UniProtKB/Swiss-Prot annotation:
Its main location: cytoplasm. InterPro entries: TLDc_dom. Keywords: Cytoplasm. The keyword Cytoplasm applies. PROSITE patterns: TLDC. This is Restriction of telomere capping protein 5. It is found in: Cytoplasm. PANTHER family: NUCLEOLAR PROTEIN 7/ESTROGEN RECEPTOR COACTIVATOR-RELATED (PTHR23354), RESTRICTION OF TELOMERE CAPPING PROTEIN 5 (PTHR23354:SF130). One of its GO terms (biological process) is response to oxidative stress. Residues 280-502 form the TLDc domain. Pfam families: TLD (PF07534). May be involved in a process influencing telomere capping. One of its GO terms (cellular component) is cytoplasm.
Amino acid sequence: MGQRTSQATLQSSTHFTSNSDILKSFNDRALKQFTVTELVSFKNKLGKDLNERLTNEELTKWLSVPQDEILLRELLYNFVQVLGNFPLMKNSYENVTGIGVLKAIILTNPERCKKYVKSRNYDQLKLWFIALSIRKTVKEDPNLSSSSSSEESFDVTRILKTFDGLHVNELSVPFAYMVPFISWLLILTTYCPINNCKLENVAMFDNWNSYIKSAHTILRSMRPMDESSWIEYEPFAHTMRSIAPHIFDPLTRVMEHLLFKDDELVDPLSENRGEIASSKLLNSALLAQISSALSKQLPIYHLQRLYLGRDHGFSMRSFQAKVFKWSAPTIMLLRGKRILDDEEYSVKNTRFRKFLHEYPKLKPSDMDTEVEEMYPAKSKIILAVYVSDPWKITNKEFFGGPHTTIVQLSPFQEVFGSSRENALYFNTIGGGIGIGNKQPVIKSTAKSYSPGNVSLTMDSALEFAVLRHAGQGGVLKPGLVVGDKDFEVKMLLQDVEVWGCGGEKELEEQLKQWEWEESEAKRRQQINLRSIGEDRALLEMAGLVGQAQSGGSV
């Protein structure tokens, strides 16, 4: 791959006389973060001098942004522009250039970023929010100081620590801009699982509206008042860290893919992986949304259809016949229509009336009206339950590993993780399916469910389900968005599906395959330094060749 040169140390005692000096120092330092092959491949893709201006059209084409998504193109161009002017994000706005894009590649990659800023605790998420929120079209004089004290102004340590004196709590991103941005990240989750991914798949944006829908779901977790509102930092950071911690992973990959020549890119969908799983309920957007919460636990390209209630019948017997032979993790998907008025619906449906009698109701006084508003009357409730262990009949016992997780996918995204093992039961003597519950009490003449504080209960006919959230102390942890709020949502199930995930062996093989493909691409990047021609000046500027440098083993 080629050895990396030692990084130029930027001590806090280094004296800078202007913002231009600071920018030049960080630009030079950025070049030293890359190998010879990476720089040459990038220069080949760039097709121009590193200091020449890049247009919006050029940059967004490389990043596979739909041409008709004007807001997204504007947002991403500004995003890269801000990162390209790091660390002076407030006072100096140069054009987007090749050097700026290289800095953006570094700053969107957690490992590269830590080395670049020389801090393992640097808050990258805050940096990204700043880059998303700042809009600046007029370039200021880079030699102007950011305060009245020039000595304080040119203190790089302070600039890094304070994000150039920006107050992030005073910044915000328009909801209208954030929707296509999150949608784009979700699409990349599907189509860019590796760094050297080829993004010329014409079908990528066929289901754009589905990804928009999933993006809305994630953004609702930030509790915006309406679609004309603005997203502020605190709800943004809390949501991304808690219920969508992997949403930015594909951003790292799509930026890294700029370091590969076009003939070194591969299409993951064409590499003998088959089509992405789909059904009446499941689609690629929903899978990407689940991946934002579960990441590597969900192998998008290896899901197997095991049970679909619509096709196989809504019964425990059909469920058992189709699912129990699968010896690896599974995802159970539920979609239901919320039952708004228990009493009114029980008059129409005698089976629901019987279920109400068996299920202990949460006291109305305990219900949080604010959370109730988060489940609109006509909204569909979609849940994904990740089950790491094989399913089995447990009429008295329980099963399930410590990674059992419920991910709510609609009407807003939420995560209910497991606090310990054995969170599930599959009761074939009338108890149905429970996650986070005690076993139901079943007698010849009566039945009584025992829901946990945070739990999901399904009746034995797979007709009704209840999501309860009533505090700490149970097998499942409270939601990370709703927190300590108490509520209960009853639903009429319309879809129940179970999809088989690849086991550890399959996941390991997939990761090894992707790693091999990337290493092969990097091997093909190897160049003969004696014939690099015009690229030699670039490498000398980076300190990788010339001046007694060997250029590394390439």
